[in-house]
Amino acid sequence: MKKIIKLLIISIIVSCGGTQETKDEVKTGYATEGFWERVGTIQIVNGVNVDTIYWDDLELETRPRQVKAYAGKHFAWLSNAGVNQPLNEDHPWKTGAGAFGTYTFDPESTNQDNMVESLTNNIGGSHLWGEGWQNLSKDNPLPVRFAATVTDKNYTQLAVRNVESDSIFGVDERTIGNTPEYAEYYEKIDETQATKIDGTWKHIANVRYINGVAVDTIGVPDGLDDHKIFHKGNVMVNFDFTKAKKGDPNWGGAGLSGKFTYKDNLLVETFNLSTGNWRATGGVWPPTPYDIEWIDDDSFVQIWKVVARQGENGELEFVENESKETNGLLHIRVK
């Protein structure tokens, strides 16, 4: 069955026009490498930091959360902040947004924008942020430019606002130094040792198992981009079903972020930030174990050991799988 799965991997890569770089071609990580949690906002006037507003100091009914992940040349971010418009049927999610793509960062640059994030996928409320956000793809990425600074513990990113549209997504040279600016302020999330599963992955197929034996493999639906970043004990998922429309339960996708452990082919994920179509009560998923079956160093199957269901109190819960059948998610490394 492993040979069949490897042939499927090759066929999917070829059909998608994708390429896999050799390990020598993979760019080493930038100083931003890792997971970062937003803790506040820095106000800047005439190029000078004048105030830092910490989210913990604000009197909010629900404290928002926003996490960014950088690994190799890929990034992802996820937020559960409320949609800043009246709730209506045009919003794919009640709260939050997220994105995935590639990025470059040049800390030595003297340009206003030393970081460029090229978005290839987006989820949640960001679908409603304008035409560029609705039509982005791997072949038509949306560049978002920042002035970024990073230390071992802190990270800030500033996108200069456009006076006419008050947008944080476009740099307008006319406003630089002439209007208050606001930088996102992050602290680094604790890390553990790197593992074999660390990296950026894409879910490309589902594998059906009976009595522990793989019997069938089916590619994911056309239009589904399901990416995952593992990095030193932290994990983030960006589930973007690009062809889902209003009324489809997958409209807007889903996003997860949290912690993981991996040892002896046992993966345990504990998501503490969930939003969109996979939002758990309180945002927290219970620890979820999986068996990992490696095809080679650049592909594995993540096999469910439990079954997800809705508990009596309406919350998501996982129970032991008593069936002879289970499913696995086939991933390939994104380089």
What are these regions (language model features)?
Residues 1-2, 206:
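Compositionally biased, low-complexity segments enriched in small residues
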Residues 2-10:
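Sec-dependent signal peptide recognition
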Residues 12-15:
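C-terminal motif of bacterial Sec signal peptides marking the signal peptidase cleavage site
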Residues 19-104, 108-259, 263-335:
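Lipid interaction determinants
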